Amino acid sequence: MPVRAATDGRFKYIRSYIPYRQFALRNYYQWGMPSNKAWDKLVLGGHNTNPDWAQTFNAHPAEMLFDLEKDPGELHNLSDSPEYAEVLAKMRKALSEHIRSTKDLGFFIPTSRVNTTLYDKVRKEKYPLNELYNLVELAGTAKASDASVFEKALSSQYPEMRYWASVGLAQLGIKGELQVCPPTLLTLMNDADPYIACEAAYAAAYLGETSKGIERLNHPAKEADRKVGYSLLECLSLDKTMQPAIRTHLADLKEKAEILPRKANEDAGLMARGILVNLGEMDIKDLHGPESYKLGLKLNHGRRPMVPLPN
C-alpha cells in the first residue's frame, strides 16, 4: 500500500494512494505484542469510545494534512479545511513533482519486479511513467466522472495500469459513486497476475458483484497465490457490510486457518486466522496458535529479568 509524505517543517502532508486499505493488517511481530492484541480486542469488540483509537482499523482519507506544531500526534486532519487549502495545494504539488523527478518505482506491483531491475527497465523501454503516476493519483481521489478513464485502463498492455484502474474503480464503489460493475473488470478477475486479479475482485465486491469478488479472493487460481487474496479478504472482513458474504466461506477459512502455515508475516494460515478474528470467530489471543506461545516461553526461559531496565 504505497504512502508518501512531505513536510515543510510546520505542516506534514500524507498521500495514501489506496485509501480504502486499512493500516491494521496484522503482521507477525506487532500482533504478537500484548498491547496490539488488547487494541484489537478493544476496537473490534465494540468497547472503544475514542474515535482516534479506531483510525487504524478504518479506511482513511487519500490526503491528510497536519499542523505539527499544534498537533504533533498527527490526529487532526486539516485537508478538508478551507483555511488550509493553499497549504494543501502547495504540499500536493511538491509531492507530485517529487515522485516524477525521482522516477518513483514504488507503484509497481510485486510481480513486475521478478527477474528484472525496474530502474533499468523503465529507462530502456521508455515506460510511460507519467501516465502511470497520473492514474495512481487519480485512483485514490476518484470521482464518478473518472470512471471512463479507469475502464479504458483495465485493458492496458501494462500490468500496473490494469492494477491501478482496479483500485480507482474500487474507490468509486466504496464511495457509492459507481454501482455497476464493468464487464471488463469481471474479466480481469481471471488475469494471469494474482495482484491484478485480486484487486479486480476486491473492486467487484463493492460494485454489485460481492459474491463473485469474495469467491475469487478465497479461491486462488494457484495455491501459491492464496496470500494475495487473503490479504484483501482481511481488509474486506473489517467492513461489517461485507461480513455476511464472507461468512459463506467460514468452514473453508476455519480449515485453512488450521492446516496452512502461520509462522511468518505472509503465511496464508496467519491471514486466515486474522480474517476469523475480524469476523468474531476467533479470539485475538489465539491468532498465532498455541505452538507460538509455547515456543515463546521456551525461547525466553532463563533470561534475566528486565525490571528495572538496564542503564
Question: What is the predicted role of each segment?
Answer:
Residues 1-80, 86, 118:
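C-terminal, low-complexity/hydrophilic appendages and adjacent surface loops
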Residues 47-62, 70, 78-311:
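Long, internal low-complexity/basic segments
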